Swiss-Prot record:
Protein's recorded name: Phospholipase-B 81
UniProt feature coiled coil, ranges: none
Swiss-Prot/TrEMBL keywords: Cytolysis, Glycoprotein, Hemolysis, Hydrolase, Lipid degradation, Lipid metabolism, Secreted, Signal, Toxin
Keyword Lipid metabolism: yes
Class in the EC hierarchy, top level: hydrolase
Annotated family: Belongs to the phospholipase B-like family.
Main function: May cause hemolysis.
Signal peptide annotation: 1-35
Amino acid sequence: MVRFGSAASSDNRRRRCWSWYWGGLLLLWAVAETRADLHYATVYWLEAEKSFQVKDLLDKNGDAYGYYNDTVQSTGWGILEIKAGYGSQLVSNEILMYAAGFLEGYLTASRMSDHVANLYHQMIKNVITEQKVKDFMQKQDEWTRQQIKNNKDDPFWRNAGYIIAQLDGLYMGNLEWAKRQKRTPLTKFEISFLNALGDLLDLIPALSPESRNNGFLSMSEISKMYEWDMGHCSALIKVLPGYENIYFAHSSWFTYAATLRIYKHLDFRIIDPQTKTGRASFSSYPGLLASLDDFYILGSGLIMLQTTNSVFNISLLQQVVPESLFAWERVRIANMMADSGKTWAQTFKKQNSGTYNNQYMILDTKKIKLRRSIEDGTLYIIEQVPNLVEYSDQTTILRKGYWPSYNIPFHKVIYNMSGYREYVQKYGLDFSYEMAPRAKIFRRDQGKVIDIESMKRIMRYNNYKKDPYTKHNPCNTICCRQDLYYMTPVPAGCYDSKVADINMAAKFTAYAINGPPVEKGLPIFSWVHFNETTHQGLPESYNFDFVTMKPVL
């Protein structure tokens, strides 16, 4: 039931306004680069009217309040920060989440439109594919909403309901912005498309006639998407020899058309005994309620990183059905409900869609005592294929110094089911877990990581002209530059890095950089050479530095 909280006394109100005044000054100092970049807004739930209202100001009495700092052109990143459920009235969790989504949609609608323009035709090539995707996603959405309605006492589905409420609010916020600006809003499907971007990497092949074949993708077929199109990434967790510190980092690989970035700090005060946290700081994109990369610092003390595993055995994709939850939805549910790597895995494995088949790394900072011990359960590795989620505690490996991730499954059952064993036999050791180029480079260079700066360097590493392990391929390295490949240059590859340590994580702080690597004399990427690729709202070239990401509200 939605109800208002008790009225504050005039003294309390004065104190609140005074603290808000100083907090507002601090916020302006901390986040504003130019006033034109910065947009504050607050969403209110109007109980009597059963409707939402948004105002262009920061009011901590509102049901959701925050800002978007649009500094993509100057730093490579926009910054979105939203707090919800901390206002003067008590609202239901669903109202709270809807308000948070509404605010995000309202603040970032223009960038959401840019992101759709840049990626829609990269992902959906023709009207036949478009209709198949629309039909599948409509069935999946209807099934999800019915499950939420039918299972109100089930904590899993209750938390799923919070996320769908946020998604609905996102659409309505985009609608409100479009109405005020006299612009065409994004459709519900376009917003669903944005959130399902990762899942579409497997869903689109699953809906193609080729998936009905009981075989494997050939090298010529996979070469069209290999390295970047399947969302490949690099990740590393590094433990110093005396447990003095633990660093974690992630570098995303995808089309450079996806470099419209937003780093998000979200803090939702969800009151539910089965919701462990509503707080997260993560790298993301316009209109996405999840990270996609993935790189999360969670209020539960968990860190989540992810890299994608290809499914070469396309017969597995026959098991993809709409009666399931997409990976982005299950990630959000697990992030909210879990307080350990094991409970994260157990939550995530439910209602497996078999899309966006990844390796997830869950680092539990609560189990780490620097300079003393790393307890069992500190690192869980979770991997998915259609109809199976495998997970295990791999803290023993982490204690030896590092955990690398480079788009090859760790668990033998996932590795074999996905077709990697056959690929090694046909195409060589580049597809093996132990002897892949990035496995060798991480093994050789991880010992050089001694501080945050050296962690940044390894995650931006690309010395393909001289490194013997790359074989002169600009993508056989930690941070790929497919645009430099002499045979078929494509504007794609490694386009960001996020780096932090566990002390920074306690403050929801990280360093992030947007753009392909320029280390070792590599040229700065510019769209001048790839103008045929839609890049609406993106910087013309990328030579940014690392930015410190830290919540200020």
